[in-house]
Structures are given as structure tokens and as C-alpha cells.
Amino acid sequence: MNQFTKPIIIATLILLLPPVAVLMVGWQWQPMGEYLWLEILYWITNTSGKPWCYLVFLFFILGLLLLFATSARQGVILVAIVMMLLLTGQGIKVLVKNTTKEPRPYVVWLEKSYRVPTGEFYQHQRKQRAEVLQRYLKADDRIPQWQLTHWKRETGYAFPSGHTLFAASLSLLLVGFLWPRRRYILSIIVTVWAMGVLISRMALGMHWPQDIITSTLISAVLVMVICYLTEKWRVIDDKKDLAV
């Protein structure tokens, strides 16, 4: 077993705890109103969506370069590895979303509460979908304005979760790189961040637990492959001092 395999598996299982628990108890999303903790989750979810995901991506890249790159060539390879990981995950997301066409939880709730058929909702263009949400929900006290704004920006299909693919891929990659090199605190921090993103996607009515589970597993497989290749190609310089 490679040195990165065990920590990635453990981190994956930790990330799967919330969606598996939600799936087992049969929890169904319902509007929760205006709560500070829910708005905090909204800001956490923004770290893995446009435009803030670009800043997070740059932060992760900078961290990798500072920790592991001992030459310009090594830095370029590290950046290419992360780009390949994220682009592959997002490519899978686009392909599967357009194939399965699973409605988001909030769209299913909209159908039950306002009799807007999910099929009819998704027949509209994205701009028209946002207009439908505005028309029906602008006066609904159960939906905070920030949540409505978030929904209007994300009116696509649910399965799989692009936010989860982004957060889980980055966090698992860093765990695979950091944990074997005794960077335990950083490994825990990125895992907690990713878990926050996963929980936020369910709490905000954006994804079903099975979306989160599948996306996390896809990320884990991709990260395993990437870590195997980096070890095979000796991309990471183990002689660099990483002790904390």
C-alpha cells in the first residue's frame, strides 16, 4: 500500500459521514428561514463556486508551490497536476449532469409548494428559470434573499455536485501529499473545509446526499490516480523539510 492510500481513504470516509447520515435518516430538504449558521454555510459554499473558487484555487496552488516545489520545472508539474485533476472532475460533472438531468432539491420543493413542474422548470433557459424563482419566492419569508440569489445563479441539474468535486478533490489531494509528510494540522484544516462545503450543499437545498456521496467517491478515485502518478514520476521532493 502506498503511503498516500490510507490517509486518502480515511479522509474520504470522514467526508462521507454527513451525506451517509442524511441518507440513512431519510432527511428531506425544507426551507429553514433566516439563521446565522445557515448564512455561514452559504459563505462556505461560495468558496467552491464562482468567483471565489478561483481565489481558493490560487491559494491552494501557492501553498503547494511553497511546500513542495524546489524548482521551476517541479512547480509547473504541480500546477499541471492540479489543473488536470480539477478539469477531469468538472468534465465528468458536465457530462453526467446533462445525461441524468436530476432536479435539485429546491426545485422539487418548488413543485410541491407552488405547483411548478420540474420538467417545465428545466425546459426554460437559465435566465427564465431565475425569473420563475424570483416571481414565486420573492415574497416567501422562508427563503432569505441571499439564498434566493444563490438559487437564481445555480438553476442547473443536481447530479453530481461540482462544488463537492472541487472541494473534495483539493482537500484529498492535499491530504495525500501532506499527511505522509506529517503535516497533520493542515490536513485536518482542509478536510474540515471540504466537509463544510459538502454539508452546505445539502443544507442550502442544492444537492441530494447521493450527489455528494458520488462526487466524493469520484474525487477520491481521481486523487488516488494523481498521487500514484506523482509518486511514480517523483514529482514531490521528500528531502524538502516539511516538519512542523
Where does each model-flagged region fall?
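Membrane-embedded catalytic cores of phosphoryl/pyrophosphoryl-handling enzymes
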Residues: 2-4, 9, 129-244
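Hydrophobic alpha-helical bundle signature of multipass membrane enzymes
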Residues: 2-155, 168-178, 188-190
